[in-house]
């Protein structure tokens, strides 16, 4: 179940009349061997490509650490759609409650209607949202979710009339309120 209009969570993309904009994850890296194997499969499927950009650390302008950065094509949300193929993913559904009943999990939507019973539950929501869903079935996990550190990432999507004349395509602020 995904409360958004489509699958993806943090790899969300938005379409505007002018361009598609990745507002969640702008790119990702793959260092773990098993994950790299999955990435290779996604590349072969045509879902991923290398991001040919070397971000700069700002304001110094030095190149960021060299590493392979990957993007989904044509937008980041394409990876979520690819992973969801063949699955029963229900979008636009907000889960309100998860309860344990005997050997199964019962899930209700925001209106209190049953979404069914399941053998297992996997939560990918940010910790503050997961905390409220975990409060009844696992107070211990709910308490851990409250303590989980959150590291926000700001993304700005701009569509300009003319390209900016900058010496870099992407930047990582190293000081100030965003650094």
Go through the PLM ranges and name each one.
Residues 1-18:
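Glycine-rich FAD pyrophosphate-binding loop
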Residues 2, 28, 83, 122-124, ...:
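Generic structural signal for small/hydrophobic residues in well-ordered secondary structure
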Residues 8, 114-176:
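Central helical "cap/lid" subdomain
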Residues 15-40:
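N-terminal glycine-rich dinucleotide-binding loop that anchors FAD/FMN and/or NAD(P) in oxidoreductases
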Residues 27-33, 48, 52, 56-84:
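Short beta-strand to alpha-helix junction loop
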Residues 35, 97, 128-131:
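Glycine-rich nucleotide phosphate-binding loop and flanking beta-alpha elements
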Residues 91-106:
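A conserved short coil-to-beta-strand element within the FAD-binding core of flavoproteins
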């Amino acid at each position: 179940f995904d409360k958004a209009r489509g699958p993806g969570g943090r790899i969300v993309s938005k379409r505007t009349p002018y361009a598609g904009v990745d507002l969640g994850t702008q790119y990702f890296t793959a260092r773990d061997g098993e994950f790299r194997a999955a990435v290779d499969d996604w590349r072969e499927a045509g879902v991923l490509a290398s991001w040919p950009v070397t971000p700069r650390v700002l304001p110094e302008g030095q190149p960021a650490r060299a590493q392979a950065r990957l993007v989904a094509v044509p937008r980041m949300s394409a990876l979520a759609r690819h992973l969801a193929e063949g699955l029963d993913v229900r979008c636009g559904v907000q889960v309100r409650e998860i309860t344990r009943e005997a050997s199964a999990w019962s899930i209700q939507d925001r209106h209190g209607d049953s979404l069914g019973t399941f053998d297992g539950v996997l939560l990918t929501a940010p910790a503050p949202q997961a905390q409220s869903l975990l409060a009844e079935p696992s107070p211990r996990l709910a308490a851990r979710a409250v303590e989980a550190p959150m590291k926000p990432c700001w993304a700005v999507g701009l569509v300009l009339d003319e390209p900016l004349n900058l010496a870099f395509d992407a930047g990582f602020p190293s000081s100030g309120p965003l650094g």
